Amino acid sequence: MPRLLFTVSAAALIAVFSAAASAQTPLEKSTPDPKPPVSAEPAPVTPADPFGAEVTLEPRTFIYMKGTATWETAFETIVDAFKTITDYMDKQKLTASDKPLAIYTQTDETGFQYQVGIPVAEAPKNPPKGDLAVAKSPGGKMLQFVHRGSYDAMDTTYEAITNYLDEKRLESEDMFIEEYVTDPVKMPEDKLVVNVYVPLK
């Protein structure tokens, strides 16, 4: 599937993500939530975490779901997509060959377009139908950053990425990729570890 073109720079794209994520407000609930509140503070970055490391990603075959979402429901949308893909893979007896991906193909202040997928060793013999499809994930030269903590706290990470790009005077493609090192379905949200890849021009 061809990637969508953009009319803004990647730095501006990341800035939009940051502004939108920081403007999120919790959804109202009719009953008290018995779970403790999730901290929006990012976990400390460890000295071993890459921040602006140059890497080359190889395209990977992945089963994905595309759609649109608002920032208020971003994490829930991504998790639901992973669940749908996992259910399909379980029925087809397919196993993941790499970490789950969320590819942001277009963003604005209110929401975003996405491709959420799970890499597999090879395309299934019976391709999925309906909401799911098979394609190659983006590859090429990219900068790698690491986020630790809740999804709501990722605006802090993206602000740091924007500052890094500005300081280094680097130009990047108008998209970004999140690779979930920890399972976003099973892991508590405030324990996330996410590789963020910014493709360079």
Mark where each language-model region is.
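A solvent-exposed interaction/effector surface
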Residues: 2-9, 14-201
